[in-house]
């Protein structure tokens, strides 16, 4: 199966995921813009998120971590404190993840153009993730990230003022990361030339 067949199949799956509400609404216009360009299609995406995660100490964190709360919008204090009521065991970590997209590029030249546009738009952590005979995968990402331990085994070690500060700080970083993503998205037509 070649690039065009992969693109067609992937876009059919994307349409299904959109209909099922599995794709962040705010990122759909960007996905559509990328997918309209011949040499590119998106394989995964997230508009960014803020959350509280409980990470086990002695189990595989990829399998056994759980979200106490996860928000793709700018979270509120009430959401934060309600999520913390569910804490039980393990490390309690406050996280903010930047928007992220994975884009399949037809060839290395297309990948290079996508990567240059991303980096010059401020998406400095963007990189080539994989290269195969069929496609090159480029990851689009900012450098903004928060990953802060705030407690352990059901006990929070910081006060509510610090938690509010951390949420405000993370919401502002997420907002800035989304602004950078939009600056890049507004330049995507340059790849049609």
From Swiss-Prot:
Official protein name in the record: tRNA(Phe) 7-((3-amino-3-carboxypropyl)-4-demethylwyosine(37)-N(4))-methyltransferase
Similarity comment text for this entry: Belongs to the TYW3 family.
**An annotated Gene Ontology molecular function:** tRNA methyltransferase activity
Function (record text): S-adenosyl-L-methionine-dependent methyltransferase that acts as a component of the wyosine derivatives biosynthesis pathway.
Q: Which PANTHER family match?
A: TRNA WYBUTOSINE-SYNTHESIZING PROTEIN 3
Enzyme Commission code: 2.1.1.282
Q: Which HAMAP family match?
A: TYW3_archaea
Which reaction is this enzyme known to catalyze?
4-demethyl-7-[(3S)-3-amino-3-carboxypropyl]wyosine(37) in tRNA(Phe) + S-adenosyl-L-methionine = 7-[(3S)-3-amino-3-carboxypropyl]wyosine(37) in tRNA(Phe) + S-adenosyl-L-homocysteine + H(+)
